[in-house]
Amino acid sequence: MGLKDAQEFLRRKGIDGWLVYDFKGSNPVLQRVLGGERFLTRRVYYWVPAEGAPTLVASAIDRGQFKDQSGMRAYTHRASMVDALSDVLRGARTVAMEYAPGGTLPYVSRVDGGTLDLIRGLGKTVVPSADVYQYAYARLTDAELATHRQAARILDAAKDWTFAHVFSEALAGRRITEWEAQQLLAKRMRDEGLAYDHEPIVAANQNAGDPHYAPTQRESAVIRKDDWLLIDLWGKLAQPGSVYADITWTGYAGRSVPARHRQVFDAVRDGRDAGVQHLEAAAKAGRAT
């Protein structure tokens, strides 16, 4: 995956090129495309045409940050920057950039409004680059997918073990808190070779309705018989290049789930299934969604 894939995608979609813009680290896509880390203090534009070699437009001050300067246009002031852009983009009508119309996808909306004005002022039609980036840099390799699936299997087993342990304690009338269950689950995940950026969430009853809830040793509800319990856990294999898995499950600490609880669970489950079916149908049809 890389620039050749990006150019192939651009040609297939009839887009003239991809303009990656960054100002002092505002767009992480640039570092991914160029590779490595650089200390850049001025505006940088990396033009990837559908056909031909890419061109870098950067300040002369930052010239030393780039080892390969063969395709570089250095500018010294704003007017020369605009001139360089105008020259580099000559002949292009449709330009993909990191922006999302209406702010619909903020993760890939990295270009400020003024820069969009600048490119449009050069007579270009700006279109979103999200699909370009995903196709060229965000598809999983077979090895990466294997790490994701292995992590998912470990998480699934850890989840089952935690529910069984917690409900056994609760039904027997023995005291166990959200935090204690969380710590047991986190240790099991680590013992199975997973790494994570935050400990899993174990939330009972109304706490399960707070998306940002996390139990602490000081503030943690006791899990009792007939309680509703949510477990949200994520992790990846503790090795380079591994990919996260993330699951959320709910359970009921009783012999029979109340009708209202089941009704809510069924609604969420059916919504999940409908979303997956929509994505599968779109993928089979080669349709973006």
PLM features per residue range, with description:
Residues 1-289:
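Active-site neighborhoods and metal-handling regions in enzymes and metal-associated proteins
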